[in-house]
Amino acid sequence: MRAIYITGYMGAGKTTIGKALSKELGIDVIDTDQKIEEKQGRVIRDIFAKEGERSFRQYESEMLCSLPTKDVIITTGGGIVERIENREWMKENGTVVYLYCDPYVIADRLHEDITRPLFQKENVEAFVAKFEERRAFYEEAVIQIDTTNKSIQEVTEEILRRINS
């Protein structure tokens, strides 16, 4: 089975759905952000603070291309779609799934989460604007699922149905 790449904005449920799919399919799930943190020896928030977003995006591209492309689910960081080479890599090497969630619902979910470097709780409009900048990139995915107000099971079952059709 080709890799399943799960994309979407921060807080859309990529990690949660990736774990649920992993359990259903009996294959590993790899989180690109977690792998970057392991390789760099620090959390993403610190990479952004010390090296900036551009360096982080380079680490992200390198990590993406180093991961397996068979029998694996890869949950990506929300900004991985900003680079065309990343979008092309995922399309060529697997099935790309976009998890959409209303950005205002996400903002409510993330209000207290300090681990999100691009989320500024005092500026929800900037958060939504960043989502809109990326939206067309996300929508290049072959499978697009609205997770707003859906359970983990509903989303997982929908992905499985669409992958197997």
Curated annotation (Swiss-Prot):
Primary enzyme class: transferase
Q: What positions does the entry give for Mg(2+) binding?
A: 15
Q: Note the InterPro entries from the entry.
A: P-loop_NTPase, Shikimate/glucono_kinase, Shikimate_kinase/TSH1
Q: Which cysteine pairs are covalently linked by disulfides here?
A: none
The UniProt annotation places ATP binding at: 11-16, 116
Q: What is its main location?
A: cytoplasm
Q: Listed GO molecular functions?
A: ATP binding; magnesium ion binding; shikimate kinase activity
Enzyme Commission code = 2.7.1.71
Report residues binding substrate: 33, 57, 78, 134
Which reaction(s) does the protein catalyse, per the Swiss-Prot or TrEMBL entry? shikimate + ATP = 3-phosphoshikimate + ADP + H(+)
Purpose: Catalyzes the specific phosphorylation of the 3-hydroxyl group of shikimic acid using ATP as a cosubstrate.
- Under what name is this protein listed? Shikimate kinase
Question: What is the species listed in this Swiss-Prot or TrEMBL entry?
Answer: Bacillus cytotoxicus (strain DSM 22905 / CIP 110041 / 391-98 / NVH 391-98)
Provide the organism lineage as a comma list: Bacteria, Bacillati, Bacillota, Bacilli, Bacillales
